[in-house]
Amino acid sequence: MINSKKAVMICCGFVGSASVFALMQSGLFTEIVLIDADKNKAEGEAMDISHGIPFASPMKIYAGDYDDVADAAIVVISAGAGQKPGETRLDLVNKNVAIFKSIIPEIAKRNFAGIMLVVANPVDILTQVAIKLSGLPENRVIGSGTVLDSARLRYKLGEHLSVDSRSVHAFIIGEHGDSEVVAWSSANVSGVPLSEMCEMRGHYKHKENTAEIATAVKNSAYEIINKKHATYYGIAMSVKRICEVIMRDEKSILPVSHMIHGVYDIDGVSLSMPAIVGADGIESDIPINLSGEEALKLKESADSLKKIMETIEL
């Protein structure tokens, strides 16, 4: 029987630990279990984060093992080699697929029946690997995808327009990586098309400005890694938001990575497209309006991911 207030984090690196810290403050769970190959690391992180519980809400945070996944509502997998300066996310494929081959079968052995959230990179590839290795229904295996990329885009647009980023509605779709696509055609600020809002705010070089913003968003992870060796706060907040949507059955629309079938002539590959997300995971895709150029770039992104999947032996 699933404990609807229990989450498990697999791997206590920068991303995993920051995500647990964010989840501790969310009030979503009363039990959070940390699993790591280094048991001392898991115990230390659990102790440290637990000391913040008096400032949050009552819960248990502790180091555990794979038996703890059996009744968990959500298992978050952040395990994987980190991205180094100069590396792309796709450079991590072989190393992190090997790690997933050791982790996912352990989860499957426990008859896990909750939602699996993949956060490790390359997230689109690893989400599809997790589906194949776990045997779980596709709707219950979700990748963090371009949730963070889209948040970065909204932040940059809000900064550019001097408006609250929460009023900006814009998605990055496709790969969480170098072939990502900004869906400019559907971008708006509280219902006002982005190009119109730019002019209203005194910005008349719309194409040049949006191109600069898209480049800044795409390169932001590389820039952060070059400066501080890892990114973890932004993705931790993304993990918290995805967990909120699932645990509260919000049916919110998020650009998470999931298996795509028949949207924009794409089939049989995991990538990010806006989807309705709730207690059962992915409910349905939302095929947002794209220009011909955007649809072509999305197809190219999907094809590049497919080619990589074809090289992986599972």
Map each language-model feature to its residues.
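Extreme N-terminal starter segment of soluble prokaryotic enzymes
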Residues: 2-7
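Glycine-rich Rossmann-fold phosphate-binding loop(s) that bind the pyrophosphate
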Residues: 12-13
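N-terminal Rossmann-fold NAD(P) dinucleotide-binding loop
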Residues: 16-17
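Conserved S-adenosyl-L-methionine
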Residues: 25-31, 135-138
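Conserved N-terminal Rossmann-fold NAD(P) cofactor-binding segment
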Residues: 31, 35-73, 87, 306-314
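Rossmann-like NAD(P)-binding element
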Residues: 54-115
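Rossmann-like NAD(P)(H) cofactor-binding subdomain of soluble oxidoreductases
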Residues: 88-154
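C-terminal substrate-binding/catalytic lobe of Rossmann-fold NAD(P)-dependent dehydrogenases
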Residues: 134-140, 150-314
